[in-house]
């Protein structure tokens, strides 16, 4: 029989980013497996607290947003495992199954020069070298060797989509404070 740990009710920070879900209990000492949404889930390792929300569907052990203190998170095989000082056994870990994990963006580690978190690129305006607006970053796709920007733009009153490889050959500059990406790209490509 699973039982919910005592977790403090909280408010989701304005800069919260959903980074994964609690997949299942792991072992008998309260560890749990995390299904991370990123292949490089550094934010899960650096944040000392996670904000949890119940799954959208299925059984819910809690409502609203709760704060989960994190004692340790690490890679194990092909997944992430973590433990909390308030989750002491398998039954308690099982009660968290399906919970959505959020981390404050301010708790993410600083990216290296020339590297960006996808969440920081969403909503940026993309212009070409001539200053022509190509669209707004709506999504990003990982195609294996490279990432592709998915832009939304309007043409003839219709919503359209444009894709630009997010590689140095096409992206000249990313200006996060200015909320702009400059690309070597033409509207008719």
UniProtKB/Swiss-Prot annotation:
Cellular localization per UniProt: Cytoplasm
Major localization class: cytoplasm
BP terms from Gene Ontology: ribosomal small subunit biogenesis; rRNA processing
Pfam (any one): PRC_RimM
GO cellular component, one term: cytoplasm
GO molecular function: ribosome binding
InterPro entries xref list: PRC_barrel-like_sf, PRC_RimM, RimM, RimM_N, RimM_N_sf, Transl_B-barrel_sf
Keywords: Chaperone, Cytoplasm, Ribosome biogenesis, rRNA processing
Top-level lineage group: Bacteria
Boundaries of every PRC barrel domain copy: 113-189
Function: An accessory protein needed during the final step in the assembly of 30S ribosomal subunit, possibly for assembly of the head region. Essential for efficient processing of 16S rRNA. May be needed both before and after RbfA during the maturation of 16S rRNA. It has affinity for free ribosomal 30S subunits but not for 70S ribosomes.
Quaternary assembly: Binds ribosomal protein uS19.
Domain notes: The PRC barrel domain binds ribosomal protein uS19.
Stated family: Belongs to the RimM family.
Protein name: Ribosome maturation factor RimM
């Amino acid at each position: 029989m699973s039982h919910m740990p005592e977790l403090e009710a909280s408010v989701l920070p304005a800069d919260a980013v959903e980074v994964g879900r609690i997949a299942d209990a792991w072992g008998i000492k309260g560890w749990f497996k995390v299904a991370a949404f990123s292949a490089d889930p550094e934010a899960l390792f650096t944040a000392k607290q996670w904000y949890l929300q119940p799954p959208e569907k299925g059984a819910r052990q809690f409502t609203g947003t709760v704060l989960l203190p994190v004692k340790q998170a690490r890679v194990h095989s092909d997944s992430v495992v973590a433990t909390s000082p308030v989750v002491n056994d398998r039954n308690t870990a099982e009660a968290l199954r399906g919970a959505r994990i959020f981390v404050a963006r301010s708790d993410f580690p600083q990216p290296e020069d020339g590297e960006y978190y996808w969440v920081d690129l969403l909503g940026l305006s993309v212009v070409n070298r001539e200053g022509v607006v190509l669209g707004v970053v709506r999504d990003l796709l990982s195609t294996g060797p490279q990432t592709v920007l998915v832009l939304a733009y309007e043409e003839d009153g219709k919503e359209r989509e444009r894709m630009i490889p997010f590689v140095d050959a096409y992206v000249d500059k990313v200006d996060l404070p200015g909320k702009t990406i400059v690309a070597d790209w033409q509207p008719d490509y």
